[in-house]
Swiss-Prot record:
Pfam families: FGE-sulfatase, Pkinase. Residues 13-302 form the Protein kinase domain. Transmembrane segments: none annotated. The keyword Transferase applies. This is Serine/threonine-protein kinase pkn1. It catalyses: L-seryl-[protein] + ATP = O-phospho-L-seryl-[protein] + ADP + H(+); L-threonyl-[protein] + ATP = O-phospho-L-threonyl-[protein] + ADP + H(+). It comes from the Bacteria.
Length: 614
């Protein structure tokens, strides 16, 4: 750690303020000395940095968490080391508090509980999908952050919580009396599933969610033979009994695989039945009160001729009604002969008024031709065909071997597709899904918003590259505009300047004056110099989807079949190229390969289009 005039630095980050101490890190607010943006550093204590068991899990978790972005998870920007101390660079947040502190003196409504539980279930499912789990979910490990005054779930210990169990108990014992420590640890143990040491972390997380949901609803933990939530909250809208009991099953396989699907609303009939059952139980519990007789007035106060009220209600007589057929019962018209003579003066004129046929002119809709939005054109650069070198010896294993390929000439957009281009496509198709229900873009991860049914681009972002687009969205847009996505080979050749075979699109080196990388956001397209072929933003700004499926060893096959390589015929991932605004310098190399699921959504994913030359 470097000291300069009593100012604490961690690498390029100047410490501004100390934040709340976490279980596994010292959190400090910092500012980057060059880009002047604030970050939160999570600095590992020396004992954890020297622990092989912890560091083994730490490295795995960090790599996996860095692949996803969610407001409820720590947004990892970078990981660094200084003097044998590791620290994580994360985005600045508005501050969080533990759920235990948030609930202190506060009773949540069912709507608030549903909002928090559904958020928790959503982020846990996302974490489970990448092979991680939370573990040790409780009132202290779950935090809340505040966005526009609304409490939202925040999980700062995903992946580490199970390793910190003993550290957490030790911290409790040091800060509280023996009696308080025992009570606190007891309340933490209730969240642990019977098989807490099991490797089926999805099931243990589901158990803890059930305990948490019960506590939020009832205000107590489900110890022993606990009462069902429906008996405590008879007017609840959601079927908490089924949700909580399924989460608390002793057998792991009996717990729900998808937590969000397990929480469902009651039907109206079930809600009514719950209320009726509660009323019946309340009536049974009520003590039978003795009847209070009516006080008898003194005879001296009763005037002659008056009767004393005895308080007895007259019994209502039952009236026998002759049954009629259903057809007779449904007749509701009034027969004029049945109307009394006293009503004849106004009934007949009224009937004649109602019998008149209203004269209504026929409405003819004026046919208007619907004007569909038309695509905006983008200038394209012609890439001359020929023989090119592909791959690199300085990168990852999937970039080998270096080999020659042959490509025909093709056209490529000079810059990535922008928000103003893509919003026209969304207006044309009228939604964010294709005909196969594939998501094309997730608006909350983009700079395009839907307000009152209209698509609006955030101010100042019209010329920025569109982000949050899936491979399906990129491919669909390209087809709509009469183009296609470039192949991985075409993209690499274009980035490397054709036959020049440059290391970076900008030449043999790259710096922040030539590309947007390791920054805080996208920049408008064409903000940096073009490469030697006249293509902009081939390095940094956004990752760009390519047409090909990804294969780790595809370059070996490409070396054997060098004519117009198109990638494997099928696969799990699609190729992404070019690095992005948050990438490190190495990710901007022309040969660097990236990949993700075609339905993956990220605020760093965009695309540009290509076209064959006929």
């Amino acid at each position: 750690m470097e000291e300069q005039s009593t100012v604490e630095y961690w690498g390029d980050y100047k410490v501004i303020a100390e934040l709340e101490q976490g279980l596994w890190s010292r959190d400090v607010l910092t500012e980057h000395r060059f880009i002047k943006k604030r970050y939160v550093l999570k600095i590992l204590p020396s004992e954890l940095s020297l622990s092989e068991d912890f560091m083994k899990v730490f490295q795995k978790v960090i790599v996996q968490l860095a692949t996803i972005r969610h407001p409820s998870l720590v947004a990892i920007e970078n990981v660094s080391q200084e003097k044998d101390r590791y620290f994580i660079v994360t985005e600045e947040n508005s501050g969080t508090i533990s759920l235990a502190k948030y609930l202190s003196g506060r009773k949540l409504s069912e709507e608030e509980i549903v909002y928090l539980i559904q958020q928790l279930c959503e982020v846990l499912e996302l974490v489970h999908e990448i092979g991680l789990a939370h573990g040790q979910i409780n009132l202290h490990s779950v935090h809340v952050s505040f966005i526009n005054g609304v409490a939202n779930i925040y999980l700062p210990e995903v992946g580490f919580a199970s390793l910190l169990r003993e550290r957490m108990f030790s911290s409790i014992m040091q800060k509280a009396s023996m009696q308080e420590s025992v009570e606190c640890i007891r309340d933490l143990l209730v969240f642990e599933a019977p098989e807490e040491k099991s490797t089926n972390h999805r099931a243990t997380d589901a158990y803890s969610v059930g305990v948490l949901a019960y506590y939020l609803l009832v205000g107590a933990f489900p110890w022993g033979a606990f009462p069902k939530p429906s008996s405590c909250i008879p007017d609840s809208i959601y079927d908490w009994d089924s949700f909580i009991l399924s989460c608390l099953q002793q057998q792991q396989q009996a717990r729900p695989k998808r937590l969000r699907d397990a929480l469902k609303k009651k039907t109206l009939g079930e809600q009514l039945q719950s209320t009726i059952d509660h009323c019946r139980e309340s009536l049974r519990a009520m003590e039978v009160q003795e009847e209070v007789s009516e006080p008898i007035a003194p005879t001296s106060l009763i005037r002659e001729g008056e009767k004393l009220f005895e308080g007895k209600e007259e019994q209502q007589a039952f009236v026998l009604v002759e049954a009629k057929s259903i057809d007779e019962a449904m007749v509701t018209t009034v027969d004029s002969e049945e109307v009394s003579e006293s009503g004849e003066g106004y009934v007949n004129p009224l009937q004649s008024l109602l019998a008149r046929e209203p004269v209504v002119s026929r409405y003819v809709e004026i046919e208007r031709e619907e004007v569909k939005p038309q695509p905006l054109s983008t200038e394209m650069v012609f890439i001359e065909g020929g023989d090119f070198s592909r791959g690199s010896r300085d990168g990852q294993r999937d970039e080998l071997p270096v080999h020659n390929i042959t490509l025909p000439g093709f056209l490529l957009d000079i810059h990535p597709v922008t928000n103003e281009h893509f919003v026209r496509f969304l207006e044309f198709i009228g939604g964010e899904q294709d005909e196969h229900y594939n998501e094309l873009i997730r608006l909350k991860d983009s700079r395009i918003q839907r307000r009152s049914g209209r698509l609006i681009i955030e101010p100042g972002y019209a010329k920025h590259p569109v982000v949050g687009v899936t491979w399906y969205g990129a491919s669909s847009y390209a087809s709509w505009i009469g183009k296609r996505l470039p192949s991985e080979a075409e993209w690499e050749v274009a980035a490397a300047g054709g036959k020049l075979g440059m290391r970076y699109p900008t030449g043999e080196d790259v710096d922040k004056s030539k590309a947007n990388f390791f920054s805080s956001d996208t920049t408008p397209v064409m903000s940096y110099p073009a490469n030697i072929l006249g293509l902009y933003d081939m390095a940094g700004n956004i990752y760009e989807w390519c047409q090909d499926w990804y294969s780790y060893d595809f370059y070996e096959n490409s070396a054997l079949e060098p004519d117009s390589p198109q990638g494997p015929p099928q696969g799990v991932y699609r190729v992404l190229r070019g690095g992005c605004w948050k990438s490190l310098k190495e990710d901007l190399r022309c040969a660097h390969r990236h990949r993700n699921n075609p339905g993956a959504i990220n605020s760093t994913y965009g695309f540009r289009c290509a076209k064959d030359v006929k």
